[in-house]
């Protein structure tokens, strides 16, 4: 029920007393303060944006050190190829896969909205993703799709090439699909050390794609930024990510403020959005509902299927029953 002024005043008094007692330590005695086995002091100004890579998820790299770390990972031959390469052609250090994936984004709308705002600003400025970058967006649920559409941001992600390809595991587990044939051939022919940047949680060599040696884990907004740059050997804090008609654009030109992000979150994130989508979670779309199935408690094997066959060894055992001895 809606509360009246008297009830509201009582609630505010209760909140004030409890907040004062439990949060503001200076107003409490030593006996009131909780004792912990370990106390960690953290200087918030020491926190830096970072990514992980190029081979393991635990290998954290500060954003300002990504370029240096990648260059140090190259052997002498790869370094020579990179030095001789043209910045506008496929070579070592170029990003061939950029994906906003489901595993680390569904419960964090703020970073997805940030990614959408970056895409919007890039489209409005005329910044495009280089041709060698394959892009995709795989939300963890349809809730994400709906609030990105409500925010008017999905259309800008689409224009950059970050179209929704599915819901759930995709590029992060190696389900990216093939690279463009011409790109694959050049990577193999020249033995290039190309990269992927995904917002997943695993980046072991060969896991994302067999032709991609260096893989980096980053937040969704950084995935968009790196895709626009098209290469990993860049200092995003200082180097331009694109030049249009002689004008240089930097990450700071695209990065949204917390105020921008909060304004959109307050507008589109509503409880009913989640209730509606999870209520319909087992219904599926029209393609799912059109599938003809037999009403049975066990799987109905099809003799015409070339994909799933009934294991023959189960039938063999059924026809050759043996007694169990000394079990």
Kindly give the residue locations of the regions a language model identified.
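Fe-S-dependent hydro-lyases/dehydratases of central metabolism
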Residues: 1-327
């Amino acid at each position: 029920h809606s509360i009246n002024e008297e009830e509201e005043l009582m609630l505010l008094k209760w909140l004030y007393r409890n907040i004062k007692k439990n949060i503001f330590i200076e107003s409490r005695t030593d006996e009131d303060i909780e004792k912990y086995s370990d106390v960690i002091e953290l200087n918030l100004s020491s926190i830096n944006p970072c990514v992980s890579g190029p081979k393991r998820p635990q290998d954290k790299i500060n954003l300002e050190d990504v370029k240096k770390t990648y260059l140090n990972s190259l052997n002498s031959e790869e370094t020579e190829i990179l030095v001789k390469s043209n910045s506008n052609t496929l070579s070592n250090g170029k990003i061939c896969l950029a994906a906003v994936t489901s595993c680390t984004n569904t419960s964090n709308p703020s970073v997805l909205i940030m990614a959408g705002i970056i895409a919007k600003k890039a489209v409005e400025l005329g910044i495009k993703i280089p041709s060698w970058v394959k892009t995709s967006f795989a939300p963890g649920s349809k809730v994400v799709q709906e609030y990105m559409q409500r925010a008017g941001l999905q259309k800008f992600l689409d224009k950059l090439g970050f179209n929704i390809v599915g819901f759930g595991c995709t590029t992060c587990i190696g389900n990216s699909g093939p690279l463009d044939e011409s790109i694959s051939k050049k990577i193999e022919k020249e033995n290039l050390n190309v990269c992927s940047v995904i917002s997943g949680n695993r980046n072991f060599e060969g896991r994302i794609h067999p032709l991609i040696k260096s893989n980096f884990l980053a937040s969704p907004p950084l995935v968009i930024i790196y895709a626009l740059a098209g290469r990993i050997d860049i200092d995003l804090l200082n180097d331009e990510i694109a030049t249009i008609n002689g004008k240089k654009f930097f990450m700071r030109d695209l990065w949204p403020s917390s105020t921008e992000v909060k304004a959109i979150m307050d507008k589109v994130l509503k409880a009913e959005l989640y209730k509606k989508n999870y209520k319909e979670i087992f219904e599926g779309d029209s393609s799912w509902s059109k599938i003809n199935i037999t009403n049975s408690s066990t799987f109905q094997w099809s003799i015409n299927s070339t994909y799933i066959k009934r294991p023959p060894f189960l039938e063999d055992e059924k026809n050759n029953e043996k007694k169990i001895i000394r079990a």
